[in-house]
Amino acid sequence: MKYLRKLGHFAERLAKAGSNDEGDIVTIIAGQTYILECKNRKSINLPQFWAEAQTEAANYAKARGVVATPPAFVIVKRRQHGVEKSWVIQDLDQWLQDRSSNAST
C-alpha cells in the first residue's frame, strides 16, 4: 500500500470480513479500480491465491452494489526482495484486456 501511494496512486487497506473478505488492498490506477490480494509466504499456492482473489473481488463489488466486479490481482512478495520486486499474478484474459484498454487510449 505504501509503495502504491508513494507512486501517487490511491490505495486503501480493506477490512477483513471472514467469508465476506474483500481483498487486502483496493487501488485506483488510471481511473480503474483493482482489488489486490497480497501474499508473503514461504510456500506459493497460485490456484488457491487466485481463487481467493476472485472471490474477494466479487465480495467487494457485491458489498458496494457495483455491477462489474473489478479486476483482481495476486501480489506475491518475493523472498529477500523489496515490495517493488513482487510478482503480479493475473490470468491471460485480464492481461489481454489491459493491453486492449491501453491501446485504445
Task: Report the location of each language-model feature.
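Catalytic phosphate/metal-binding cores of nucleic-acid and nucleotide-processing enzymes, i.e., regions
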Residues: 1-105
